[in-house]
A protein has these predicted regions:
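A glycine- and charged-residue-rich anion-binding loop/surface
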Residues: 13, 37-45, 62-63, 354-357, ...
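Solvent-exposed loop and beta-edge segments used for protein-protein assembly and interaction
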Residues: 15, 140, 286, 459-461, ...
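C-terminal tails and terminal domains of large nucleic-acid-associated
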Residues: 517-553
């Protein structure tokens, strides 16, 4: 068999989140990223969604390692769940490792997992793969792209990136290395499509710092800033701005406290001296000396900002003496929850600053011109747009065509497809690996499927009606009047007539059935279910879930 490299995305295509890509070469496998996605509005009770890794479980003896580009949830969120199924070593940078360790500790997996920290610029040998770590800019520190070297050629996997010429840590993206790889020849490029709809360049993270300085200077109120917990450089800039005008900073919200602790311990966040204080200490200080950094930029229900807005926060009570700055844009789908929190803050007399035009947030993803730079530097033979919804992948393809790429060398695939690259050819094999969604609900992983969700949706929309029936084991006679129990369907006290009709209907259905010989209880249940459902739909235009319960005595 001729040499072949297979690239199999298991998540991250035609969606935002749960990024995961499998590379297979010479009978060996490496996995890049292992993310989760937020549940949709119709996924009742689901905590998060992770990729289906049955393909990896099937081939677990061939996996040589998992490589992580950076520490965002859509790239590391599924790590603990996947490690329970396949225990493989993890290779990543220091901050990413610190954030993964937090997760593994929660799941009791820290002892059994091998995490190897790698500096950008270094190369890791994993079986027949050599994976080179290349520094990039993004909205979390210590992000990398990978150059995956194989016998067939080199694949550049950008991960999430932007080109920031004035990053907070002074570490500019290693464009020179992308250019060198391009000179040596890049077999394929997989690049971030998130911001391909936006022309121009993404603004530098530093512009947000200037906004903070402007909003902090001369402000007489307490300042509360919410942003993504993982945005270490944003939090650093808040601390710097606070110190400059003589304010103290306290952090609240579990994920924010965890991330800032890890980032400070590892030296990625360097707060000015004596600036950071405990949340319980800051309360006794004058309001104009306080800055509070909090979670909740997406309006999440149990987040610290949400609890402040709805008067449920243990330490902080907000009111007219407060200025809240929302330093994040709403992730698509979260707009309603964010405006709910903003409205509640307004109701309490809080000044809320959340305007996009105010340079309160910059994206961590490359816009069109930056993507063109990466394409021009790497000059790939083949191109696979990743990390985006269908329109983004299509637009990224158009951008590559503008850059002079050959149409037949660009492939837009779906999760579970395999892109097979040979010495002279590339083809996409649809549906090569299973790649559905696995739902996490509490401790259960994958035990809630489409059927359970359908039931939850049904219950949420129309409620349920339970029909309880006792019949004689001897002759099938009814022993008592049927009992009707409803939940989430009607208010019983106002609907006695309807319930009596249901009892009568159930009795007549059971009577009709009694005459039948070889009585099958399931048949009776089915008959009652359809009679009651049909009647209720006619009477109320609703279709609750009907559960007949029959006991033989």
């Amino acid at each position: 068999l001729a040499e072949q490299l297979k690239i199999i995305p298991l998540g991250g295509l035609n969606e935002i989140g749960k990024n995961m890509t499998v590379y297979e070469y010479g009978g060996e496998i490496i996995v890049v990223d292992c993310g989760m996605a937020f549940p949709g509005d119709d996924m009742y009770g689901i905590d998060c969604v992770i990729p289906d890794v049955s393909y990896l479980v099937k081939h677990k003896n061939r996996i040589r390692g998992m490589f992580i580009t950076h520490g965002h949830e859509d790239h590391i969120g599924a790590v603990p769940y996947i490690l329970k199924k396949v225990n493989i070593p993890i290779y990543c940078t220091r901050l990413t490792a610190g954030l993964i360790r937090l997760k593994l500790e929660e799941h009791g997996l820290l002892k059994s997992t091998k995490i190897v920290t790698v500096e950008s610029g270094m190369t890791v040998k994993a079986g027949k793969f050599s994976v080179e770590f290349i520094h990039v800019n993004h909205s979390i520190a210590d992000s990398v792209a990978f150059a995956i070297h194989t016998g067939l050629g080199t694949v550049v996997h950008t991960g999430d990136f932007k080109i920031d010429s004035t990053p907070i840590d002074g570490e500019v993206i290693d464009l020179a290395r992308f250019g060198e790889l391009g000179k040596q020849g890049v077999l394929a490029l997989l690049a971030d499509s998130t911001n391909v709809e936006r022309p121009g360049y993404t603004m530098s993270e530093r512009t947000v710092g200037r906004t903070f300085n402007r909003l902090f200077q001369g402000c007489k109120q307490r300042i509360i800033v919410t942003t993504f917990a993982s945005n270490v450089h944003r939090i650093q800039q808040i601390m710097d701005a606070a110190a400059e005008c003589g304010r103290k900073v306290a952090v609240t919200g579990r994920s924010m406290e965890n991330v800032t602790k890890v980032a400070m311990d590892l030296g990625y966040m360097k707060p000015p001296k004596n600036t950071v204080v405990d949340i319980n200490k800051i309360k006794s200080m004058p309001l104009e000396k306080q800055v509070i950094v909090t979670t909740g930029s997406q309006g999440e229900e149990m987040s610290a900002l949400y609890r402040m807005a709805f008067s449920q926060h243990k330490q902080i009570e907000v009111g007219p003496g407060d200025r809240v700055i929302i330093s994040a844009s709403a992730i698509p789908g979260n707009e309603n929850t964010v405006s709910r929190v903003i409205n509640e803050l307004f109701r309490k007399g809080v000044e809320v600053i959340y305007d996009r035009a105010d340079m309160l947030h910059v994206s961590g993803h490359a816009c069109q011109e930056e993507l063109k730079i990466i394409h021009a530097l790497t000059k790939p033979k083949y191109f696979i747009p990743v990390h985006g919804e269908q329109r983004m992948l299509q637009l990224h393809k158009d951008l590559a065509l503008q850059m002079g790429m050959d149409r037949k060398n660009i492939v837009i695939c779906d999760n579970g497809d395999a892109v097979e690259i040979g010495a002279r050819s590339m083809k996409c094999v649809p549906g090569y690996a299973p790649a559905g969604e696995v739902f996490v609900d509490g401790y259960g992983v994958g035990d809630v499927g489409a059927v359970v969700l359908r039931d939850r949706k049904h219950l949420a929309e129309d409620g349920m009606v339970v029909v309880v029936l006792s019949i004689s084991a001897q002759n099938g006679d009814l022993l008592a009047e049927p009992e009707i129990i409803t939940r989430g369907f009607i208010y019983v006290k106002d609907s006695e007539e309807l319930l009596q009709d249901l009892r009568n209907l159930t009795m007549s259905t059971a009577e009709a059935y009694r005459g039948k010989r070889g009585r099958d209880l399931n048949e009776l249940k089915g008959a009652i279910r359809s009679a009651v459902s049909n009647y209720l739909f006619k009477a109320t235009k609703r279709s609750p879930m009907v559960l007949p319960v029959i006991t033989k005595l």
